[in-house]
């Protein structure tokens, strides 16, 4: 088949700027052919190259005594002791999920699972952070149903528990939903597999499902804004098969145990192109591929299509040649394709042969480590300090408004569609703060959470970035876990706009400061830019996934409030209402500055919770909705009423940071008061547990009525 002639329209469709296309010509000393241009386009787009963000990502703290592998591999790796490690990452699948919600979300789950088991880890937990447009928008209902069904359909069939996540709604996501998928797995520290190729003349092997035309150009699509041609992009969305992925997992882990693997990489964005280039570049080698050997499921596929297909459930491996027969037998047993499709070469070349013709001959390093990198112009965000006065409200009426909001009501309708008990090690399920999974066969457990408050980030990117990390830290602490490390998923608009780039730079600064202060280095992550439709961008959404360790199940804080318990508030309360849930849901306002984060207080207060866990009955952190919403959540979980002593609006609904609400016995409360005094931690009695109502000052409502609103609001809207 004759390749298309390169035209200006084709160059533009591949996402090249004039300068970038000129640079390609300069590198080659000639114009690229169609296949070569597709390869350069895939590797130089934002999704694969991080060309607009690399400069700033390098400033993040990525090291620590617990870190085995930081950013740059398929996933981050953190030591959890006893010769074991946790492997984890969060990644976006935003653009595909908006175009084709079910498959976009499903393949997002599949892709992040492969990132984990490619490293030699068996997946043990999944989470997702989902952002949708306003409820009344005509597309929101379809997106919610499709995405939730896609996440559940893939994860449930694969057999990994989905143990937590977030769901939010805001008009800024009307034209771009966000689907951020997280996965974690367990591995032995001496059995980790990396992607860098080594050895000249080693066979390059294709593993897994066959290649089709689905997803061709997906990475390029994910690096561009949406416009009125969005429906034309549907063929760029991948199609997933979770049962094939399950077989691929088992075959891959069995293959690794055989000793046949030199290096291995999953095929994700840009498919065969990106996996081969990354393996060669990291190993300082070239790669020659023979596409005639690639297993295909569609007739007459071109070299361009095979190189850029993003068909799912595929891996690429550099194999020990003497164990080829052993490796082939394993994959044939699992009814998966196994094909030697190339070899490593000493030259810095990426050579593609198809039907006996050389379809591409490119300098491999120019596609990866020496790809373009930009220092985009940026302007700092001017923090929004001005805020109109906030009227006093009836606290129960305001609380009821929050409980009915899709942003703060129960997500039961969502997580009931996810299997969160498969594998039998789930200790704390969705809806109870951080998810907790036992390390199988041990007395240890791992806690997982994902957090961000986009309103804060828009108002003040630095403080919003800090707060995302701090809230993740608090969620882990509230279940008794010691926070270990984080992964970031940076979702932003068009980086060519200085104000958007300024949001990104500010958020990175805040995240870096918080991770450094809280000893939670960033070990993996993902950047998703150009989340805009017709020039309108999303709220800046730097999602933080975090992992914590419970060295013993005795460390777990998993109790509930009981009749007669005292309520204690840890941390300073100053009544910060700027950018609060109260303003957004009750007054339809988003004004004022984001709450500022005292990282020293976060560390002290978190250490206090963990050091005194034996005195704590129930614990939750304070975030959206402040003390009032936290108190309701404690009451709802216990099925027992609560009386709060305070009654003014700012104290009840302010969102000051570094705070926890504790329920415990009177004697334990006295012991905690003494310990807090010694530690220099603010601690105050704010109420008591008992009865069947929620009482706040002079306002009161039956807990059963409030719980019904909270429990049913989401399903009433979306079921």
Swiss-Prot record:
Subcellular location: Cytoplasm
Ligand binding (Mg(2+) 2): 115, 266
Record has Glycosyltransferase as a keyword: no
Catalytic activity: N(2)-formyl-N(1)-(5-phospho-beta-D-ribosyl)glycinamide + L-glutamine + ATP + H2O = 2-formamido-N(1)-(5-O-phospho-beta-D-ribosyl)acetamidine + L-glutamate + ADP + phosphate + H(+)
Active site: 47, 93
Residues noted as binding substrate in the record, renumbered to the chain: 92-95, 114, 238, 310-312, 528
SUPFAM superfamilies reported for this sequence: PurM C-terminal domain-like, PurM N-terminal domain-like
Gene3D superfamilies: PurM-like C-terminal domain, PurM-like, N-terminal domain
Record EC number: 6.3.5.3
Positions with a binding annotation for Mg(2+) 1: 91, 526
Lineage: superkingdom: Bacteria
Keywords of this entry: ATP-binding, Cytoplasm, Ligase, Magnesium, Metal-binding, Nucleotide-binding, Purine biosynthesis
Gene Ontology MF terms: ATP binding; magnesium ion binding; phosphoribosylformylglycinamidine synthase activity
GO cellular component, one term: cytoplasm
Main location: cytoplasm
Residues that hold ATP according to the record: 50, 89, 488, 525
CDD domains per the UniProt record, alphabetical: PurL_repeat1 (cd02203), PurL_repeat2 (cd02204)
A Gene Ontology biological process term: 'de novo' IMP biosynthetic process
InterPro entries listed in its UniProt record: PRibForGlyAmidine_synth_PurL (IPR010074), PurL_linker (IPR041609), PurM-like_C_dom (IPR010918), PurM-like_C_sf (IPR036676), PurM-like_N (IPR016188), PurM-like_N_sf (IPR036921)
Keyword Ligase: yes
Pathway per the UniProt entry: Purine metabolism; IMP biosynthesis via de novo pathway; 5-amino-1-(5-phospho-D-ribosyl)imidazole from N(2)-formyl-N(1)-(5-phospho-D-ribosyl)glycinamide: step 1/2
Biological function: Part of the phosphoribosylformylglycinamidine synthase complex involved in the purines biosynthetic pathway. Catalyzes the ATP-dependent conversion of formylglycinamide ribonucleotide (FGAR) and glutamine to yield formylglycinamidine ribonucleotide (FGAM) and glutamate. The FGAM synthase complex is composed of three subunits. PurQ produces an ammonia molecule by converting glutamine to glutamate. PurL transfers the ammonia molecule to FGAR to form FGAM in an ATP-dependent manner.
Subunit structure, interactors included: Monomer. Part of the FGAM synthase complex composed of 1 PurL, 1 PurQ and 2 PurS subunits.
Family recorded in the similarity comment: Belongs to the FGAMS family.
Name used for this protein in its record: Phosphoribosylformylglycinamidine synthase subunit PurL
Source species of the chain: Jannaschia sp. (strain CCS1)
Gene name linked to the record: purL
């Amino acid at each position: 088949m004759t390749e298309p002639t390169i035209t200006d329209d084709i160059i533009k469709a591949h996402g090249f700027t004039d300068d970038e296309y000129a640079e390609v010509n300069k590198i080659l000393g000639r114009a690229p052919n169609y296949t070569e241009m597709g390869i350069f386009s895939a590797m130089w787009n934002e999704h694969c190259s991080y060309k607009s963000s690399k400069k700033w990502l390098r400033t993040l703290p990525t090291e620590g005594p617990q870190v085995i592998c930081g950013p740059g591999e398929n996933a981050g790796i953190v030591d959890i002791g006893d010769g074991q490690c946790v492997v984890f990452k969060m990644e976006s699948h935003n653009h595909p999920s908006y175009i084709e919600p079910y498959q976009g979300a499903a393949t997002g789950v599949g892709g992040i699972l492969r990132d984990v088991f490619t490293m030699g880890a068996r997946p043990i937990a999944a989470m997702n952070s989902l952002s949708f447009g306003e409820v009344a928008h005509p597309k929101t209902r379809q997106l919610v149903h499709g995405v939730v069904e896609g996440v559940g359909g893939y994860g449930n069939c694969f057999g990994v528990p989905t143990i937590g996540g977030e769901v939010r709604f805001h008009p800024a996501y009307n034209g771009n939903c966000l689907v951020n998928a997280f996965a974690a797995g367990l591995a032995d520290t001496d059995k980790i597999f990396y992607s860098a190729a080594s050895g000249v003349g080693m066979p390059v092997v294709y593993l897994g499902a066959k290649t089709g035309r689905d997803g061709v150009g997906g990475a390029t699509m994910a690096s561009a804004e949406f416009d009125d041609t969005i429906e034309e992009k549907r063929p760029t969305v991948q199609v997933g098969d979770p049962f094939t992925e399950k077989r691929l997992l088992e075959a891959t882990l069995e293959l690794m145990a055989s000793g046949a693997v030199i290096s291995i990489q999953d095929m994700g964005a840009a498919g065969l192109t990106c996996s081969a280039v990354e393996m060669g570049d990291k190993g300082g080698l070239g790669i020659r591929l023979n596409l005639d050997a690639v297993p295909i499921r569609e007739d007459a596929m071109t070299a361009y299509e095979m190189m850029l297909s993003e068909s799912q459930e595929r891996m690429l491996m550099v194999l020990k040649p003497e164990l080829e027969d052993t490796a082939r037998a394993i994959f044939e047993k699992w009814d998966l394709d196994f094909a030697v499709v190339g070899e490593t070469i000493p030259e810095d070349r990426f050579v593609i042969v198809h039907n006996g013709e050389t379809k591409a001959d490119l300098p491999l390093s120019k596609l990866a480590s020496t790809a373009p990198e930009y220092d985009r112009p940026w302007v700092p965000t001017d923090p929004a300090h001005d805020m109109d006065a906030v009227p006093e409200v009836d606290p129960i009426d305001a609380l009821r408004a929050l409980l009915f909001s899709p942003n703060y009501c129960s997500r039961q309708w969502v997580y009931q569609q996810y299997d969160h008990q498969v594998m039998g090690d789930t200790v704390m399920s969705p809806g109870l703060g951080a998810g907790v999974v036992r390390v199988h066969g041990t007395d240890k457990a791992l806690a997982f959470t994902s957090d961000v408050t986009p309103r804060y980030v828009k108002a003040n990117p630095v403080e919003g970035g800090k707060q995302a990390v701090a809230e993740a830290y608090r969620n882990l602490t509230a279940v008794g876990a010691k926070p270990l490390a984080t992964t970031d998923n940076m979702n932003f608009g068009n980086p060519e706009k200085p104000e958007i780039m300024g949001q990104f730079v500010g958020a990175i600064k805040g995240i870096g400061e918080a991770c450094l202060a809280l000893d939670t280095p960033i070990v993996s992550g993902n950047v998703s830019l150009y989340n805009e439709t017709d020039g309108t961008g999303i709220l800046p959404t730097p999602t933080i996934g975090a992992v914590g360790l419970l060295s013993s199940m005795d460390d777990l804080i998993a109790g509930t409030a009981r009749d007669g318990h005292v309520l204690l508030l840890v941390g300073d309360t100053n009544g910060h209402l700027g950018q609060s849930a109260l303003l957004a849901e009750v007054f339809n306002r988003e004004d004022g500055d984001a709450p500022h984060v005292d990282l020293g207080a976060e560390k002290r207060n978190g250490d206090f919770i963990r050091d005194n866990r034996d005195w704590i009955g129930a614990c939750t952190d304070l975030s959206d909705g402040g003390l009032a919403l936290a108190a309701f959540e404690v009451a709802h979980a216990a099925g027992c009423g609560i009386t709060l002593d305070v009654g003014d609006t700012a104290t009840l609904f302010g969102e000051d940071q570094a705070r926890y609400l504790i329920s415990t016995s009177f004697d334990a409360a006295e012991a905690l008061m003494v310990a807090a005094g010694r530690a220099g931690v603010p601690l105050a009695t704010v109420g008591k547990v008992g009865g069947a109502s929620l009482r706040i000052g002079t306002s009161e409502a039956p807990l059963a009525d409030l719980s019904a609103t909270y429990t049913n609001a989401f399903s009433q809207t979306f079921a």
